[in-house]
Swiss-Prot record:
Residues 1-138 are annotated as: Modulating. The gene is Rxrg. GO terms for cellular component: cytoplasm; RNA polymerase II transcription regulator complex. Acetylated by EP300. A zinc finger (NR C4-type) spans 139-159, 175-199. Its main location: nucleus. This is Retinoic acid receptor RXR-gamma. Receptor for retinoic acid. Retinoic acid receptors bind as heterodimers to their target response elements in response to their ligands, all-trans or 9-cis retinoic acid, and regulate gene expression in various biological processes. The RAR/RXR heterodimers bind to the retinoic acid response elements (RARE) composed of tandem 5'-AGGTCA-3' sites known as DR1-DR5. The high affinity ligand for RXRs is 9-cis retinoic acid. GO terms for molecular function: molecular condensate scaffold activity; nuclear receptor activity; nuclear steroid receptor activity; retinoic acid-responsive element binding; sequence-specific DNA binding; sequence-specific double-stranded DNA binding; zinc ion binding.
């Protein structure tokens, strides 16, 4: 294979076993030369003698402590071309290379042979890969590609699932042949008896499946216990009590087809909202753990969510109204009046995205209260001193609402999700109301922080 190698490689004087060779030599092979061309017409290569191995600078120099990391980094990066040039003041140790010694000891092209474990001369600097590092595990049962070690044996997902089902359901199989069926990738489903027996023979453990099932049961019980703790900490009964406590005390809403003629719809809505804002603080104080927060955080949460909280209330109150909304004052605002007042677009969204959806799913007051509590406990409200505590309270309300819907409406597994889907619409409509100054008369000249602070400092009135 290397018989003609001498025609393409020119070794300089003093290389290998020639008389001019003394000690270690730094060399570079010349380029291939055409036969018959004199060497004088090409660049010459000179031997550069290397002295004894050099060490790093003496202890005490600033760079001495960085010597070892510097060598590692430069070795990993490697020089772009040629030999590595050591920076001034640093002497790098030139480690002896067994591969370099092998090359230097060659005296002729016939003596050049590939190094053991290497595919050829060209890959001299790359160590061979160990055979074990490329081995891929196969399923011990059917020979398919293994997805890992399952129940003590490397197996594929198919055999893993088969064994687990067999153990968990305590299945019993029979073989139609002689109990020696071939189990491979193509025929593994042919005989369940022989497949199961092979699982056992190859080392799959029944107890591993049983332990896995026990861990799953314990995990489910733990999650249920945590959820139960959340329900006890945020009982839906108290949330419902808060809703009922602030319900407008009007015996009758009167004729819902007639609305006040003294004011325009926007004024009526603002007046009703102004009255409801006082009861909103009373409602929030009745929600479990809200009063445990700092007074400043209570103000921030109410300031961040008052518009959504009020919109949710009058939307749910309006499910019995045809094409309009019912205010806490007992006044009914029709769609046509809202359009004539210039707030028709946002009014239509309230009817379509909130009132209509609440009516279709027959949202009850407990669910409404939970949704409002979720809005109230907003951990993203700016300025909170302890947002993580607020987030924990919100998660407890989530758990309470989910448990309530599962217990009250077991035939509607998707009800919890449908309830939560009203929250983005409520947020969007609330922001739009502020954008249109929908409640511009609500506060007047009083800053909202001071306004809410005065109400929060008022003792809770039990009625």
């Amino acid at each position: 294979m290397y018989g003609n190698y001498s025609h393409f490689m020119k070794f300089p004087t003093g290389f290998g076993g020639s008389p001019g060779h003394t000690g270690s030599t730094s060399m570079s092979p010349s380029v291939a030369l055409p036969t018959g061309k004199p060497m004088d017409s090409h660049p010459s290569y000179t031997d550069t003698p290397v002295s004894a191995p050099r060490t790093l600078s003496a202890v005490g120099t600033p760079l001495n402590a960085l010597g070892s990391p510097y060598r590692v980094i430069t070795s990993a990066m490697g020089p772009p071309s040629g030999a590595l040039a050591a920076p001034p003041g640093i002497n790098l140790v030139v480690p002896p290379s067994s591969q370099l010694n092998v090359v230097n000891s060659v005296s002729s092209s016939e003596d050049i042979k590939p190094l053991p474990g290497l595919p050829g001369i060209g890959n001299m600097n790359y160590p061979s890969t160990s055979p074990g590092s490329l081995v891929k595990h196969i399923c011990a049962i059917c020979g398919d590609r293994s997805s890992g070690k399952h129940y003590g044996v490397y197996s594929c997902e198919g055999c893993k699932g088969f064994f687990k089902r067999t153990i968990r359901k305590d299945l019993i199989y029979t073989c139609r042949d002689n109990k020696d069926c071939l189990i491979d990738k193509r025929q593994r489903n042919r005989c369940q008896y022989c497949r199961y027996q092979k699982c056992l023979v190859m080392g799959m453990k029944r107890e591993a499946v049983q332990e896995e099932r026990q861990r799953s049961r314990e995990r489910a019980e733990s999650e249920a216990e945590c959820a139960s703790t959340g329900h006890e900490d945020m009982p839906v009964e108290r949330i419902l009590e808060a809703e009922l406590a602030v319900e407008p005390k009007t015996e009758s809403y009167g004729d819902m087809s007639v609305e006040s003629s003294t004011n325009d719809p926007v004024t009526n809505i603002c007046h009703a909202a102004d009255k409801q804002l006082f009861t909103l603080v009373e409602w929030a104080k009745r929600i479990p753990h809200f009063s445990d927060l700092t007074l400043e955080d209570q103000v921030i949460l109410l300031r961040a969510g008052w518009n959504e909280l009020l919109i949710a209330s009058f939307s749910h109150r309006s499910v019995s109204v045809q094409d309009g909304i019912l205010l806490a004052t007992g006044l009914h605002v029709h769609r046509s009046s809202a359009h004539s007042a210039g707030v028709g677009s946002i009014f239509d969204r309230v009817l379509t995205e909130l009132v209509s959806k609440m009516k279709d799913m027959r949202m009850d007051k407990s669910e409404l209260g939970c949704l409002r509590a979720i809005v109230l406990f907003n951990p993203d409200a700016k300025g909170l001193s302890n947002p993580s505590e607020v987030e924990t309270l919100r998660e407890k309300v989530y758990a309470t609402l989910e448990a309530y819907t599962k217990q009250k409406y077991p035939e509607q597994p998707g009800r919890f999700a449908k309830l939560l889907l009203r929250l983005p619409a409520l947020r969007s409509i609330g922001l739009k109301c502020l954008e249109h100054l929908f409640f511009f008369k609500l506060i007047g000249d009083t800053p909202i922080d001071t306004f809410l602070m005065e109400m929060l400092e008022t003792p809770l009135q039990i009625t």
